[in-house]
């Protein structure tokens, strides 16, 4: 009898293995997730690459596009594992302060949070945070040919003060292009302030060479630019801040890949540092990054995450990955689930 049951069990096991997989149906809870972003996308068609809206492709399909104003994505009925939501509505070009107000008033479900907004986040408010995926750096124009002025400014910047006060300790202080979580060696790049050496370098410059203009493109970076200018003054440099393309720019580049070599290539391209050679080991990757930063053409300052404030009715796992990709397919809204 025992032998017979063993044979039957073997036959049944083989049948189960041979059966084709049946796509698992998912419940349809419905509802519209209301998202606000500050990006002002004026293109004729919705973006097809990058982070944010393009991440919805596959699970959702675009059904309405109002350039610079609004995008609506509806659940893709053909997707394997249909989203719980019926749709996602994204309001574009919303200032961070207004986003935070809309979240507090229940007019939005997911909003972006900057350092100023994080100060005012109510206790217990749910947030989603990516890994530090934004590189904030100073990049010198080609016309700034004297390496001494570049090094003097690099040594004068007090990253710790900016990080603690202006950034609310968000992200990480860094002197590297790649964040520590990705490369494992970012700590080897110095972030120390050395005012005596900075002053010594500045003292050897002509009066004209000590005058620099600092430009920025993103208004969120203005407070950091102002603090960098104050630090520069302590080193004997005169830095004026404006939104134009200055002698040095305060810029932000995004980590687009979890592969360190590809990520370094993308950041180097975004900062106009050239294309690093292909790295086939952590040691060669470190050497290439060190070569890109020699001469202080670019001075990394911080690595910052994406941070989102999330409304109370949003349920499910975090809607962003470590790289900041949107993953809304497993979210549902309270009151729409039986």
Feature map (PLM): residue ranges:
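Exposed, low-complexity coil/turn segments of extracytoplasmic
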Residues: 19-63, 79, 109, 155
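Short, solvent-exposed loop/beta-turn-alpha elements that line the ligand-binding surface or hinge
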Residues: 48-65, 81-86, 120-130, 139-147, ...
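Structural transition elements
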Residues: 168, 172-205, 216-223
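Short, well-ordered beta-strand elements
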Residues: 31-38, 58-63, 70-72, 86-92, ...
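Paired acidic/hydrophobic, glycine-rich loop segments that form the ligand-binding mouth/hinge
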Residues: 36, 108-115, 247-253, 300
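Alpha-helical secondary-structure segments
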Residues: 34, 87, 132-175, 209-221, ...
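Ligand/substrate-recognition segments at binding pockets and active sites
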Residues: 67, 203-257
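Ligand-site clamp/hinge motif
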Residues: 77-119
């Amino acid at each position: 009898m025992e032998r017979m049951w063993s044979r039957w069990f073997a036959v049944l096991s083989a049948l189960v293995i041979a059966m084709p997989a049946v796509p698992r149906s998912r419940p349809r809870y419905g509802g519209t997730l209301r998202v606000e972003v500050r990006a002002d996308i004026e293109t004729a068609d919705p973006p097809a690459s990058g982070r944010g809206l393009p991440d919805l492709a596959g699970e959702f399909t675009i059904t309405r596009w109002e350039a610079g104003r609004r995008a609506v994505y509806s659940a893709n009925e053909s997707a394997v594992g249909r989203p719980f939501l019926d749709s996602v509505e994204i309001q574009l070009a919303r200032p961070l302060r207004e986003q935070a107000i809309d979240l507090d008033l229940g007019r939005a479900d997911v909003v972006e949070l900057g350092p100023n907004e994080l100060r005012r986040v109510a206790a217990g408010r749910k947030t989603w945070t990516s890994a530090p995926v934004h590189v904030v750096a100073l990049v010198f124009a080609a016309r700034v040919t004297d390496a001494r002025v570049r090094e003097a400014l690099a040594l004068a910047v007090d990253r710790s003060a900016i990080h603690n006060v202006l950034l609310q300790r968000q992200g990480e202080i860094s002197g590297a292009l790649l964040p520590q979580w990705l490369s494992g060696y970012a700590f080897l790049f110095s972030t120390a302030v050395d005012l005596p050496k900075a002053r010594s370098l500045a003292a050897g410059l002509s009066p004209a060479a000590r005058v620099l203009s600092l430009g920025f493109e993103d208004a969120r970076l203005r407070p950091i630019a102002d603090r960098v200018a104050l630090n520069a003054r302590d080193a004997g440099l005169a830095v004026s801040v404006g939104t134009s393309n200055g002698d040095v720019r305060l810029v932000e580049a995004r980590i687009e890949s979890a592969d360190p070599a590809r990520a370094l290539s993308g950041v180097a391209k975004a900062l106009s540092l050239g294309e690093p050679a292909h790295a086939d080991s952590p040691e060669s990757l470190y050497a290439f990054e060190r070569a890109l930063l020699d001469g202080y053409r670019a001075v990394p300052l911080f690595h910052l995450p994406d941070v989102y404030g999330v409304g109370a009715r949003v349920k499910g796992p975090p809607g962003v990955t470590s790289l900041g990709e949107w993953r809304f397919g497993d979210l549902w809204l309270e009151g729409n689930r039986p």
